[in-house]
């Protein structure tokens, strides 16, 4: 991979061991997918996929704490996927025991880590960060470092932003450094459809069934779906949604 002088300096450890390790991880990630360079993340905010404090996710919590201890901050404020349990919904003793004390016993401490690293605010927990009320709607052409599957699809297909389906933790690494590997849906060539899918149903198709059927067929390729305008129109409005 060809790096800029600044990126190479980070990789060489000139800005500390932690940032060097993050750059090394992103370089390896990019090389696995054939990236030959890194590009700047250009969106105002990021969005993280890992929002739940499962006790078994110790490596994640340890990594987050190491970033905090080293004074590493995300270059962007970020929203994050929903909490696993809505604390505003009443729960009985057994539910509290199972969910809050056993399954998600690290939830409170993990949320404190998220705040320390750059969480937008107390209400920034959502799968749909691009909604107007959330304030995290990227513009067309902006390069993102997101991981949440549905948000990545929406950002690419509806908003025209550019983002690969990154993994959890990889999302915040791109946000910390301000760079992501240049491959896949970030490139003009990678955004070109390799499948044409014609929808010829006699009634509006179920979104989950249609999406699953297309996904199982095209896998990692890019589909161009025709025929949905019959049911959804050509504008993204309440009728379409």
Stretches with model-predicted labels:
Residues 1-241:
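Non-transmembrane, aqueous-exposed alpha-helical and coiled segments at domain scale
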